[in-house]
A protein has these predicted regions:
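Glycine-rich beta-alpha loop segments
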Residues: 1-55
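Short glycine-rich anion-binding loops that position phosphate/pyrophosphate groups of nucleotides
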Residues: 6-9, 38, 62-64, 102-106
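Glycine-rich, small/polar surface segments that engage phosphate groups of diverse ligands
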Residues: 34-83
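Glycine-rich, charge-decorated loop segments at or immediately adjacent to ligand/cofactor-binding or catalytic sites
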Residues: 40-47, 134-146
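A charged, well-structured terminal subsegment
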Residues: 92-96, 147-193
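Internal catalytic-core helix/loop-beta-alpha segment
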Residues: 78-117
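Short, acidic/small-residue loops that bind anionic groups at enzyme active sites
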Residues: 60, 100, 107, 114-140, ...
Length: 193
């Protein structure tokens, strides 16, 4: 389960959400794949998973090892040469994606996973967990682009937006079981468990 999230803000509600997501992933016996930082929501999601005995994989570019304080407690810490390589490793290691409230880094990772899913490059669930309305303006703007042809309705349909942790994980469950969003087996795609 790949979780995209912030590496800067320390808002208590964000850290609590990230910790609950990590714990819920571990409670289901799933592996957490995250950005490999030990700060903000990125650190909280990993700590949450480990607090329940979960297995964590952190993926961080060399350039961010000190800036984001690499999560040296991760069960696996993968250090990549570039941000692009980081995203590829995270996508390859994951069976589903959840984006928590975050900034441009979170959005960049999320948009790449969402776009790849929409274009048929993978059939993994892509979920936005937004209990605070953080992304409301962005989602309204994207929906507004449907009428002008800049965003296809099928692209919006490929994204699941929820406000509850359990709903996010339920939306990801098919991918974590090796199935796509329709229940079909994802042949040829790696199941990270």
């Amino acid at each position: 389960m790949c979780v995209y999230c912030a590496a800067g803000p320390t808002h208590p509600e964000l850290l609590e959400l990230a910790g609950r997501v990590g714990a819920a992933i571990a409670d289901r016996g799933w592996t957490l794949v995250s950005g490999g930082g030990n700060v903000s929501a990125m650190g909280a999601v990993a700590h949450g998973a480990r607090s329940r005995g979960g297995y964590t994989v952190g993926v961080i570019p060399k350039a961010l090892v000190h800036r984001e304080l690499a999560d040296v407690d991760a069960d696996e810490l993968v250090v990549t040469d570039t941000m692009r390589e980081r995203k590829q490793v995270m996508e390859d290691r994951a069976d589903a994606f959840i984006a928590l409230p975050g900034g441009i880094g979170t959005l960049e990772e999320f948009f790449e996973a969402w776009t790849a899913g929409y274009l048929g490059m993978h059939r993994k669930p892509v979920v936005m967990l937004d209990p605070f309305g953080h992304y409301d303006g962005l989602l309204d703007w994207l929906r507004g682009l449907i009428d002008t042809g800049y965003v296809a309705q099928a692209a919006m349909d490929r994204l699941t937006v929820v406000t509850e942790v359990d709903a996010a994980l339920t939306a990801c469950a098919a991918g974590m079981a090796g199935q796509d969003m329709t229940g079909e087996t994802m042949a040829g795609e790696t199941m990270a468990g």
